[in-house]
Amino acid sequence: MSAPHRLSVVIPLYNEQQALPPLLEELDAVLGAIPGGPHEIVAVDDGSTDATLATLEAAARRDPRLVIVSLSRNFGHQAAICAGLDHATGDLVVVMDGDGQDPPGAIHRLLAAQEHGYDVVYAQRVARKEGALRRAAYWLYYRIVATLSETPLPLDAGDFAILSRRVVDAIRATPERHRYLRGLRTWVGFPQTGIPVERVARLSGTSKYDARALFRLAFDGIFAFSLVPLRAAALLGVAAMALSFLFAGYSLWAKLFHDASPRGFTALIMAIVFLSGVQLFFLGIIGEYVGRVYEETKARPLYLVSRVVRGGQ
């Protein structure tokens, strides 16, 4: 049995006022059963427009373990997690969503697995309490990102994980603005493993990850960890050149030896339109990479903090 740890639980929150009370109650019971400490809950309010912040402030007056990090506006889920990591002081840090779908009771299992010498133990989702369409979208999303990424990414592993202090410090040291924390968590290395965890239904409300947010997260995962789109553009260009040379050779052979010229004006126009579309598509991909480089050169902070509340004050 390893020495007792001081645990920090990082929770990004956006408009979760109804889910907060039962979630904090569950976490209170879970942390109370874990030896060591003092443990803390780092709740990051990502510019909520409902009473999430007021609910947190009321809870902090009753529970000094609750740390509130209030961001100046909505910076996004990944930025909110980074804010939590920056303010977490524990030697082990748990990252979990604030909607209750990551069951707090699974923290015991993550901690037990971590004691076998792992720096990262992530939850692999074996079931989801969502509609068939959303489950299919997530299944496809994980496999597309894992296939295109040059960093091996575990399938069906979300942000719910326990991280050692050296992993947290390594992630905090990465300078990029477009964060895909599931990828960064893998990229930093160190011993890692996953355990199966059933993802339960939301405590209340609807998911803040709509189709647009999911696409944006997928783009961050692909463009931050892969040059495959650029290489695909180059390979397609080589293939198009090879086909054009073959067609030119065939045309020359037909003219010299059979006094005939290939016909098919419609096919020619279709080929031109198709290749023009392909060029514009890959020009957009190149533009996405260039735009991300431009965003990085501005060196703006990933988030801005409005205020921090520790110990109820």
Predicted features along the sequence, with ranges:
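Conserved amphipathic alpha-helical interaction elements at protein-protein interfaces in regulatory
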Residues: N15, A29, A33, A58, ...
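A generic fold-level signal
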Residues: S2-P4, G36, A88, L155, ...
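Gly/Ser/Thr-rich helix-start
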Residues: S48, H77, I81-L85, D99, ...
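Acceptor/aglycone-binding surface of glycosyltransferases and processive sugar-polymer synthases
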Residues: V69-R73, H77-H87, Q101-L184, V200-F219
